[in-house]
Amino acid sequence: MKIKNKYVVGVHIMFYEIEMVSEYIDSCIGMIQNIENKENLTFHFTWNISEYFESIDTTKISKEQLSNLFNLQVNRLSNLDVKTIIEIKTNDDDVYNIADYRRDLNYNYCTKYDFILWGETDSLWPKETIEIVEQVEEYSKNNNISKYVLFFSERKMWDPSWQPIEHNDFTDVTFIDNNDWALNNLSSSKSYMTLEQMYEVNSKAESLDVRILTNPKFDGSCLVIKSDLIKSGVNIPQSLLCSGEDTSLADMAKLLLGDSFVQYVIKNILRVHNRRHPNKRLYISNENNPRGFCGDAKGNWWNILEQMSKHNLGTIRQQSHTYTMKDVFNKIKKG
C-alpha cells in the first residue's frame, strides 16, 4: 500500500537491553513489509552506552561488542531501503534517559513528520500499525480531529483502571497477583509473548473495533502521536527526570485540551509490552535482575531517582520544590 502520511518511529536503547533488540526490529520489519513508498518512514534510534547508573560488566561483554550487536540489528532495517537515524549517548554527554529521549523526539520531529511513534525495546509493533493509523487519520480528517493519540490494546492489566485499553480477548480474565501466574500466563501483561503469538491473536480481527476515550489511558510503548498534538504545546515536562514520562504526556494533553482530548484505542489489535522480558537487563556489573524488577533489585539509586521523578510529576500543578538530577546524585552519594 502507498501511505499518505510521514512517520518517524523512535526508540531509546540502553546497553543492557541489547538482547531484546532483534525482536523489536522483527516487529518493525513486519509493519513496513507492505508499504510501497518507504521514503515516508524514518526509524530513529538512540544507542545509550553511558554508565551513570549501571556499569557494563566487561567480564561478559565489551562496549565494542555491544555496539556491534546494535549496529547489526539496525542494519537489518537499513538494508530494506528505510531511512535510519542513529544517535549515540556516552558518559561524555549529560545524563540521558527515556524521558529525555521521548521529549526530544517529540520536539525535534513534530514539524517534520505527521506522526511520531514511540517504540520501546521490550515491545512489539503490530504488523497492521501503519495501515490502521492511515485509516484512523482519514476518519479524523472527516471529523475535524487533528490532535490525538492512538493506542493498541493490552493484555490483562493489574487493576481495573486499565480496562478501557485491554484487548477484547483478555479483558474478562481475572488478574492473579502472584509471579507464578503473572509471569507465565499469556493473558497477563507481565508475561512474555512472542511476535508470532501476537500475530496469531491479531489474525482473528475481521474488522477494527475502535473506541474513543476522552480521558487518557496509555503507557509509552507503541504509542502513536499525531504531531499536531505536540505542535500545540503538549510534551513531557522538563521536570520529569525519568519515571512516568508517559503519564506526564497524558496529563499535559488533558490539561491543554480538556474535554477535546481524543485517544483512539484499537480494542481488537494487540501490541505487546514485555515488561518482564527474560532478557530485559543483562550485562550489568553487580546486578542479577534479568527481568528488570524495580525497587531494591535495581539498587537504591533507582528508588531515589523514581521517587524524585514521581514527586515532580505529582506536583506539576502545585507550588513545590522541583528536583533535578543534581539532587538525585547528591542523595545517592549520601547513601
Question: Which functions belong to the PLM regions below?
Answer:
Residues 5-13, 28, 41-47:
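Hydrophobic targeting segments
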Residues 11-26, 49-53, 93-96:
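Active-site beta-to-alpha loop of glycosyltransferases that engages the nucleotide-sugar donor
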Residues 23-40, 52:
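Short, acidic, metal-binding catalytic loop of nucleotide-sugar glycosyltransferases
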Residues 48, 119-122, 153:
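Active-site acidic Asp-centered loop
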Residues 54-113:
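Active-site-proximal specificity loops/subdomain of glycosyltransferases
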Residues 106, 126-237:
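Conserved catalytic core of nucleotide-sugar-dependent glycosyltransferases
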Residues 112-124:
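Short beta-strand-to-loop acidic/aromatic patch adjacent to the donor-nucleotide binding site
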Residues 205-228, 232-335:
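C-terminal catalytic/acceptor-binding lobe
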